[in-house]
Amino acid sequence: MTFLSVFANGTTQAETPHVILKIEHWSTKNGVPVYFVAKNEIPIIDIGVLFHAGSAQDNHSPGIAQFTAQMLDQGTQNLNVDQIANRFESTGAHYSAGINQDMTVLNLRSLSAPQYFNPAFSTFSVLLRDATFPQTAINRIKKQMLISLQQESQTPSALALKTFYQTLYGSHPYASPILGNKTSIEQVSEEQILNFYHHNYVAKNAMIAIVGNVTQAKAMSIAEQLSGMLALGNASLPMKAPSMPHIKNHIIKVSYPSKQTTIFLGQIGIAIKDPDYFPLVVGNQILGGGILTSKLFNEVRDKRGLCYGINSGFKPLQAAGPFFIVLQTRRDQAANALSLSQQTLKNFLAKGPTSQELQGAKQALIGSFPSSIASNEGILEKKKKIGFYQLPLNYLDTYQQKINSVNLEQIRHAFQRIKPEKMIVVMLGKQ
């Protein structure tokens, strides 16, 4: 349990849980950074291989990063898609691949006993080295991604978010939609996939995270085997900083046949290494991050019933990700809900939080932190973030302390970079 005491000046002092995760860090012979945590409570090993190969690397082929990631387990020189799936299933292992704007992540979860881990790891390694991208699989993934695009077009929140990103980032690579578009996916060729694969799935572009019931010596062997599957290649260039688009109309209305209106409003936010990261995290918890306790929820949903749900957030990336407020409301209430959301934000910027609100936000963030690293998966996710974005090795050990050290003035100062009058607004619904 965390105990918090509030002092007269509005700062907060806490007896924070002293969570220590011993993260071992080294590089393989060909320079791939490795992050390892031994966790022996359960007989599981989790491995993540990350590449600087997110949708921001799509260039002129929207969706190619996602397409390539989905193709890796579709066939190798000696195994077809069914044989690959059977090899993982027969050992109880789970393989997955996913991307965001910055990265592609390949994950393996396996029992640690050699009779299960060795064949699962062997199959995982082969996918890195010997993926062949057969045409039959390309056709199959095309169909799957076109279905996903159709589902996206039928999901108001997903369609509004896609429009928000494309409007906010304009010509910046973060505007590239993860799923691509119908035309780009229909035109994907084997040559495009191979070019993306050979350019991005290389040692200079990679990072490895390992968590679980394994010794450091064995983890070093695992990392060497994985990195040895990769050509050396070249690292992707650092992502350029985005800037707010120069457009006359900041309100984008998208016609959609739904009874409710989905609204996104926001601006360019922060990169993950921004010095204001912690004041903004704590401040956002007060503004809209605490789903049932935030100012936005209290003013727009609880007091006036103008929306079904509302929240705000930052999505820090390698370069500046977005700051956003999102809500769903009835069409006839959309204008009032948007106006009140904007006014609530302006009031927060003008007055800042109270000492009591600061206490509550810290308590919520500090209190929820231990559970986020209680499992292998949670630790792996945190290590991916630390390794990929080159955060300090003691990031997890100091997280609660840094949350606790945030004061009212830091929040007020950090939030002055939020400019309501320049925000992009996307309203999706019947017009």
Ranges and model annotations:
Residues 3-91, 122, 194-299, 424-431:
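His/Glu-rich zincin catalytic helix
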Residues 37, 42-67, 81-127, 158-183, ...:
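M16 family metallopeptidases and their MPP-like homologs
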Residues 78, 128-136:
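Short, polar/flexible loop-turn hinges at active-site or ligand-entry regions and domain interfaces
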Residues 101-108, 136-147:
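Short, glycine/charge-rich beta-strand/loop segments that flank catalytic centers
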Residues 110-112, 145-152, 243-254, 364-372:
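Short, conserved secondary-structure transition motifs
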Residues 188-192:
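Active-site glycine-rich loop that binds ribose-phosphate moieties when present
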Residues 193, 411:
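Acidic/histidine-enriched active-site and ligand-binding environments that engage anionic O-linkages
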Residues 415-417:
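Short, exposed beta-strand-loop hairpins at the edges of beta-sheets
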